């Protein structure tokens, strides 16, 4: 996403600090808990995709690192975007609406794919570009010096996106740099440690080859993405008409088999969802399993849900969560 580079009205300044920057976590979040990394830089120069681990956690032509929130409810509560390294603000854009690209009301995206964004010069030809920021949330001005970890805006839904996330592009001159493996070219390594340009504290943005659980919980009826994005259904009680466990995961591969089992207080399986293997890779996948309430309501006790993703007969992702009624 390079659309901020083309804005002729913006003042261009340079920061003095030379050398390769070390990148701090650019979001005020805890990786693996309330933020996740669905997409890396696409290192494949031609058709096809390749991330730094030689996997496919990216998409065609993707030039940055995406760090997403769990849902729109988190975005509305407000999550700060942080400067990844010290530098000086050289370009910015504000005023783009926070609306999903899938919304018929979304404005034209050509040349404005980044949405609201901030570009910071870190010296030595290095810069970072933060995209999809919330309208009206940018706290910095062109020419302003910033420190690593300083809040510069909040996560939004502006530009070419359908879910709340930060898109962070790293460049040295005209070259896009993959912060997990900054060496240039299309090379990748299944054994790359992924530290790259990141500080030790940001290393929690670990590569998750088995995908990741984005949301998990219980509901009193069928669950869809809209309910999950709104923050999840309310906690069911003993008089709920049904008891449903749900999980939404990201970065699953074709052939993966998600399995979700709901067990009652007596250890008896109440429901189990196990479909056919996925026909293709899924950026996100929602599964739920549930049962209608018995006469007289749900017995008191601990209800347990077990989620697993099976790949070639091996469990690559799992989560257990409970509900006490």
Question: What residue spans do the PLM features occupy?
Answer:
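Short, well-structured beta-strand-loop connectors
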Residues: 80-91, 139-154
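Aromatic sugar-binding surface patches on proteins
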Residues: 279-293
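A short tyrosine-centered beta-strand micro-motif
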Residues: 299-310
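Short glycine/threonine/proline-enriched tight-turn/helix- or strand-capping micro-motif at secondary-structure
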Residues: 44-83, 92-110, 222-240
């Amino acid at each position: 996403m390079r659309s901020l580079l083309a804005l002729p009205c913006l003042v261009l300044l340079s920061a003095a600090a030379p050398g390769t920057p070390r990148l701090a976590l650019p979001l005020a979040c805890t990786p693996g808990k309330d933020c996740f990394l669905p997409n890396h830089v696409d290192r494949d120069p031609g058709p096809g995709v390749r991330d730094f681990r030689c996997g496919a956690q990216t998409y065609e032509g993707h030039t940055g690192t995406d760090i997403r929130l769990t849902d729109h409810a988190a975005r509305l509560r407000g999550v700060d975007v942080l400067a990844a390294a010290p530098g000086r603000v050289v370009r910015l854009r504000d005023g783009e609406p926070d609306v999903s690209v899938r919304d018929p009301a979304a404005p034209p995206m050509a040349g404005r794919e980044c949405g609201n964004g901030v570009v910071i010069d870190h010296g030595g030809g290095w810069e970072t570009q933060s995209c999809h920021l919330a309208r009206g949330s940018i706290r910095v001005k062109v020419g302003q010096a910033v420190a690593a970890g300083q809040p510069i805006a909040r996560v939004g839904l502006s530009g070419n996106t359908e879910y709340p996330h930060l898109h962070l592009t790293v460049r040295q001159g005209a070259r896009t740099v993959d912060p997990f493996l900054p060496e240039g070219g299309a090379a990748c390594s299944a054994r790359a440690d992924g530290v790259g340009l990141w500080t030790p504290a940001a290393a929690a943005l670990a590569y998750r080859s088995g995908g990741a659980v984005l949301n998990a919980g219980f509901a009193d009826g069928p669950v869809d993405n809209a309910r999950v994005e709104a923050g999840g259904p309310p906690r069911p009680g003993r008089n709920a008409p049904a008891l449903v466990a749900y999980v939404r995961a990201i970065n699953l591969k074709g052939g993966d088999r998600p399995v979700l089992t709901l067990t009652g207080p007596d250890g008896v399986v109440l429901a189990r969802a196990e479909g056919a293997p996925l026909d293709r890779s899924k950026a996100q996948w929602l599964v739920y399993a549930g049962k209608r309430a018995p006469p007289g309501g749900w017995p008191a006790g601990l209800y347990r849900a077990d989620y697993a993703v099976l790949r070639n007969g091996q469990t690559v992702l799992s989560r257990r969560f409970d509900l006490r009624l």
